[in-house]
Amino acid sequence: MVPTRLFDCIEMHLKDAPNFTMLAGKENGEWIEYSTVKVSELVNRLSSGLLYSGIGPGDFSIEGRDKVAVISKNRPEWVMLDLAVQQVGAVLVPVYPTISEVELEFILKDANVKLIFVNDPALFEKVNALKKNLPNLKEIISFEKIDGVRNWRDLLLPLTENILGEIRAISDKIQYEDLATIIYTSGTTGVPKGVMLSHKNVLSNVIDSLPCFPPGENMKALSFLPLNHVFERMISFIYLFKGTSIFFAESIEAIAQNLKEVKPHLFATVPRLLEKVYEKIMEKGSELKGIKRSLFFWAHRLGLKYDVNKKFSVLYRLQLSLANKLIFNKWREALGNNIVCIISGGAACQVRLLKLFTAARIPIMEGYGLTETSPVISVNRYEEENRMFGTVGPLIENVEVKFSEDGEILCKGPNIMMGYYKHPDWTAECMEGEWFKTGDIGVMVGKFLKITDRKKEIFKTSGGKYVAPLAIENKLKESRFIENIMVIGAGEKFTAALIIPSFSNLKAWCHENNVQ
């Protein structure tokens, strides 16, 4: 079948792989796996419960469709809710669990949310405290058990032919161009912007990104980036359409343990988490003594020389092979020993990390995009010939870019959002005809897109010199003693930097060097 809606991912695998593990989560210390058949059953039963609760497509217009919010950590129920909401023609509005009460109230009011699913008692209390200010809100439902609160399982009505027929009658009317989700992002206005994404936006991005991924069947992925973010959500749909099992990590703190348990082939991450992994590795390497320490830093130096676009001598290749057997194999073991590649996005990844991990046979597919572009514009492919360190890769199929006079990246394609919810004025400001203005400055290096800075972050000193801070910040952040940094100097004689030190690494260094 040719999918035209995001929820078609179930139908695609139902006949050929009914017992394939589609989703998995840990409950009471055990991994609970959900097959394609089980996911299909639960999604249909949840769809039935949503319809019975008065949630549906209304008149099938953007305003007419009911809005359902989810405020939860990653878990199988999150994805099943997403698919069920889509299937009944409603719209899912994901919200970060850590969001402030002020922003939460604004989003729930702005979207006219009728039903909210929360993860746990703490989030229930957070939403319940706002309920008096939310006249459209009918009910708060919890994934975890809370006394006196309806649980998501209470919505799982028994399936009958009549109910299935009712669900099919609605889902058959849902079109490729229809609204699928509203994702709120913090905008320059200070007010969250509701980005409207259609099935076409996200599904075209999924289909056009699939060829960039490594080949292979029966693969497993570990999911820990928030599904509230378009990056992890779209990657999850890639897994669902590709037939890759998604295992949801218990928490950020449990990732290391979950990697060893699940032994995934893939996972998506942000550069900061990779930096933390690297810092841990370097910390352990620094604690080694004698020959082990010498071998560790020899392998490290070899890795820093690696480049996917360079031909190396036989001697270097032999040395790197030895380094992989003696040192880098421990890196792969820490990630579960099955990693085929890591997908990185959300910010620029340090080139030294790309070099080291790739040398250690852990390729990193670094990509680029925004919520408004569903999100992928470009990505470094799995194949080495389509990767270049320091860039965000070639454009994906059916997506075009051009550059304005000041170097801003403009993007056009089926992935460009429908617009900002209730704000055609904001939409008009960020569009130039069919071209979306990304706000990022970039250049093409051959077929590879390179981001040089954020347009709004470039500043001018009092001497008239323009400064692009991103490259400076990324270089300085390579120091393990710097947690975060911001280059400043607009209107001043010189540039400076505000630095947040990495106190844990500074303390360790002081201890090693007898500094009181």
Please provide the spans of the model-predicted regions.
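Conserved pre-ATP/AMP-binding loop-to-beta segment of ANL
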Residues: P18-T21, S142, D147, E161-Y184, ...
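Conserved AMP-binding/adenylate-forming core of the ANL superfamily
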Residues: M22-R75, V79-L83, S100-E105, R153-L159, ...
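Conserved structural elements of the adenylate-forming
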Residues: S40, N44-S48, Y176, V195-G216, ...
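ANL superfamily adenylate-forming
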Residues: F124-Y176, I281-K330
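Conserved AMP-binding/adenylation subdomain of ANL enzymes
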Residues: L203-K220, L227-F328, N338
